[in-house]
């Protein structure tokens, strides 16, 4: 397996960059464009492996899609216009593709099957199957409740669906299924999650009512979706690696431009401010999705406590919060993050293992970590492993910048899932 030497940096990270398009929005723009009438034009599309899995699956479902770099044109087939695929739909490693497509396919007029790679095939899918069944969806899973999934498309009925897990993927699957149902559907969640699906559907013409006080969305089917132009903002989950690096690497001062500032995605920024980071934001646009430039510089950080109520807005960034804690003054505790155990890897375990290799004082807990911050670490093992997890690989690369010991990353290509140009962009700022 490939191994990459990681950079040790004492000069600091300086300059500015724009990160790739947001992964969540790229997925959803493709899918909603496919269900619309007319042409949807997507710019700054994320050309990562997960989003390409969605693109290829939609093509297999009869959708005409043309991509030139980050520019994508989708010729919609309407809400009921998808066609039966000739073979199982390959999801590769993409949980978002899988769960959202389960919702879309549940109301179509044919049977389809979703399959994935070894990692995705271990991830739980009953959590989607159950809520969709409330609308009458017929979805078969393995005995373990995992892929392959067989979706028997047929007419759906509106329902009231109360989600037990705060998950934007599950919520979105129900909303996309509800577009095809007879009668309205109301889906409620225990805590607010990212709302890109709702924002995009409203822009395309769907009839959605959002009740923020009740954390619920009501979908009234029958509205005609019409193709739109979508400019995908920079992915805050990708920007997060540079914001954290800028805070913890000495002599750093950097700006990440045109980042999505959707309030459901700015949890890391709030944590950085709470920890005392020297950070500023210049909002540059506001419309379907607010965006702006975020500037950060080397900061003296204090310990932080993160609990379950904080988790939905920074679920993908929690490993980076753990890294901030490892560099801060004092003892930090992160809890309520059990959802990390069913990501591409068990991220609670793999982050703890990575930190122990680096010499970080970390205690793994069932739903998070207890971390004692230290100014310097004593590396125990130099070979760090991404375990095929894109976010773990990038976390290791950022952590390595603080090391005085040469470090190596096993399976660095995993970062291509969400950020193919990560190492090149790190080099632009001096991290090479």
UniProtKB/Swiss-Prot annotation:
Catalytic reaction annotation: 3-phosphoshikimate + phosphoenolpyruvate = 5-O-(1-carboxyvinyl)-3-phosphoshikimate + phosphate
Main location per the UniProt record: cytoplasm
Keywords: Amino-acid biosynthesis, Aromatic amino acid biosynthesis, Cytoplasm, Transferase
Binding site residues for 3-phosphoshikimate: 23-24, 28, 167, 169, 316, 343
Pathway membership, UniProt: Metabolic intermediate biosynthesis; chorismate biosynthesis; chorismate from D-erythrose 4-phosphate and phosphoenolpyruvate: step 6/7
Annotated GO biological process: amino acid biosynthetic process; aromatic amino acid family biosynthetic process; chorismate biosynthetic process
Domain of life the protein comes from: Bacteria
Entry EC number(s): 2.5.1.19
Gene Ontology CC terms: cytoplasm
Subcellular location field: Cytoplasm
One Pfam family named in its UniProt record: EPSP_synthase
Catalytic residues (positions): 316
Any one GO molecular-function label of the UniProt entry: 3-phosphoshikimate 1-carboxyvinyltransferase activity
Binding annotation for phosphoenolpyruvate: 23, 95, 123, 169, 347, 391
Quaternary structure (record): Monomer.
Family: Belongs to the EPSP synthase family.
Family annotation (NCBIfam families): aroA (TIGR01356)
Function, in words: Catalyzes the transfer of the enolpyruvyl moiety of phosphoenolpyruvate (PEP) to the 5-hydroxyl of shikimate-3-phosphate (S3P) to produce enolpyruvyl shikimate-3-phosphate and inorganic phosphate.
Protein name: 3-phosphoshikimate 1-carboxyvinyltransferase
Gene from which this protein is expressed: aroA
